């Protein structure tokens, strides 16, 4: 069975404007048992939820995955792999040093995606393409 992870940006679009509703609905309808939710995405969404209503909307997204045990959380090995990838990027592109802290969560998400043999869906072409130059993983960049 194919496995899928959805990046934070697509869920933000879903919550704020509904622009990704058709994409997410199609994926859920086609392959619901193969969809997983990353604890990284949960953290990023909760960090952006400034109201009680926003928090409830975010929790409504990941609670079903908690109930069925399909939450993906980076392991110690994933953190080490992410560190090695970020070091390699810095070695190849010293001009990106100030960008590295912003890449940590994306790198952890990429490493998690790769380790479980999943496909990651995102709109963030630039950051994930940069990570793919160092470590391959399955990626679908949406519109």
Question: Over which residues does each language-model region extend?
Answer:
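Short, hinge-like loop/turn segments at secondary-structure boundaries
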Residues: 52-56, 89-90, 138-141
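Acidic, PIN/NYN-like endoribonuclease modules and their adjacent C-terminal/linker elements
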Residues: 1-3, 110-143
